[in-house]
């Protein structure tokens, strides 16, 4: 590492903080604290993208992007990559191909700001133009990382094309070259899939997780100036997970998951605190911070684990033999973890959605499975669930958004067709659901 510059009580504080913050802003991938929760205002059950029922606005955003929208105040921010090839697109569904997309044309990488109330484009900025330095997965894009904001600055990562900072009015502030980030099939570096991990902000730091074929690292930059603060080397193969921050009991932990280890770090210094092995070969979901627990999941070959980790661990906390818990792990299961969607904790349940639409709900404290159900009729899911107003929203790649009631049994309330592919995780702000489709950004809310 290189230096450059009681559960109940916590549950109440955590739930209250998430509710208050998420009612105002959705500043990063999966919103405040990466929770995916935005209570505090009523949200719609049904809408109709074709007729406009409960659709407040719809704004086209050119390009191919699977990054998610973020919201701060009266602005929505989205990133995109506009290819000069009119045939550029993504391939949805379930398949096992490892070949990257053949789109190697000139691109323009952009950050776009929309008015949250009207959908009007307030500004757009071209961060970079050129031929991509690495290829991308057919299901992904050259703009896969979700921006992050602290309300003054918006930070967006375009991977090998750089890390960029703007103020909320679109003024360029700084940029950082992260190097060529070749993330792809670990068995053959020629199969490039692109990066997917989004930057996060903690206090005065922007933190990025860059797990690549060679030279993986975790790095922090000053959010105001872009100056490097610390950089920690990682012995990891490519992963696509966004890090998360646990804060409680007077300390903070930066949680990263990857194939070799899930790790906890001191976010202020980059020093490793603990590590846990036992993950699948590909790791994508973001760690989820719950009531006195850190939930880590992944769901590729050969295992699909769910770990409920107690904060404050030190050293190697890997389970031994047939163990399912130890001093640092409250509970675990070797099966049931999701491949792409990040789970969500809502109330006292952990909801885990598989890429094939199989949904399982667990008691978050005990790990007991409450129910299992199938969402939809066999479609594929890349977007992560989000929740508000006692409801959970799940978007399929085909563009159907399923709304079901949170609770001890699966109860589907509505299915809403967006009319286009949806890969990005929705944002929720003040009762309005911001849905990023492959062509348009929608604001869904209850009309007077």
Protein language model features and the residues they cover:
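N-terminal hydrophobic targeting signals that begin at the initiator methionine
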Residues: 1-2
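Bacterial N-terminal signal peptides
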Residues: 7-20
């Amino acid at each position: 590492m290189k230096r450059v510059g009681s559960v109940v009580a916590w549950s109440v504080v955590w739930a209250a903080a998430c509710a208050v913050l998420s009612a105002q802003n959705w500043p990063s991938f999966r919103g405040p604290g990466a929770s995916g929760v935005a209570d505090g205002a009523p949200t719609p059950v049904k809408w109709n993208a074709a007729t406009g029922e409960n659709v407040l606005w719809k704004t086209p955003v050119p390009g191919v992007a699977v990054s998610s929208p973020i919201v701060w105040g009266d602005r929505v921010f989205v990133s995109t990559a506009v290819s000069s090839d009119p045939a550029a697109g993504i391939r949805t569904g379930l398949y096992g191909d490892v070949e990257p997309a053949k789109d190697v044309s000139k691109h323009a990488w952009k950050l776009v700001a929309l008015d949250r109330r009207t959908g009007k484009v307030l500004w757009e900025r071209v961060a970079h133009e050129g031929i991509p330095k690495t290829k991308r997965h057919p299901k992904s894009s050259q703009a896969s990382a979700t921006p992050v904001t602290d309300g003054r600055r918006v930070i967006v990562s375009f991977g090998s094309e750089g890390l960029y900072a703007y103020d909320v009015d679109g003024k360029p502030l700084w940029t950082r070259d992260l190097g060529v980030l070749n993330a792809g099939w670990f068995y053959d570096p020629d199969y490039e899939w692109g990066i997917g991990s989004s930057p996060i902000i903690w206090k005065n730091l922007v933190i990025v997780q860059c797990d690549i074929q060679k030279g993986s690292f975790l790095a922090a930059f000053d959010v105001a100036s872009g100056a490097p603060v610390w950089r920690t080397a990682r012995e990891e193969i490519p992963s696509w997970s966004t890090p998360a921050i646990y804060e409680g009991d007077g300390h903070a932990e930066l949680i990263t998951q990857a194939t070799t280890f899930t790790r906890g770090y001191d976010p202020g210094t980059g020093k490793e605190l603990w590590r846990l092995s036992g993950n699948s070969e590909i790791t994508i979901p973001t760690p989820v911070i719950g009531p006195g627990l850190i939930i880590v999941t992944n769901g590729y070959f050969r295992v699909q684990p769910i770990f409920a980790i107690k904060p404050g661990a030190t050293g190697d906390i890997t389970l031994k033999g047939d163990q399912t818990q130890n001093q640092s792990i409250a509970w675990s299961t070797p099966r049931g973890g999701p491949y792409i969607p990040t789970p969500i904790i809502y109330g006292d349940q952990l909801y885990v959605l598989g890429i094939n639409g199989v949904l399982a709900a667990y008691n978050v404290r005990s790990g007991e499975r409450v129910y299992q159900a199938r969402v939809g009729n066999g479609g594929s899911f890349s977007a992560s669930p989000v929740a508000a107003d006692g409801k959970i929203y799940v978007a399929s790649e085909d563009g159907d958004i399923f709304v079901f009631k949170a609770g001890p049994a699966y109860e589907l309330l509505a299915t809403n067709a967006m009319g286009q592919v949806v890969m990005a995780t929705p944002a929720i702000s003040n009762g309005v659901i911001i849905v990023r489709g492959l062509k348009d950004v929608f604001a869904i809310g209850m009309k007077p």
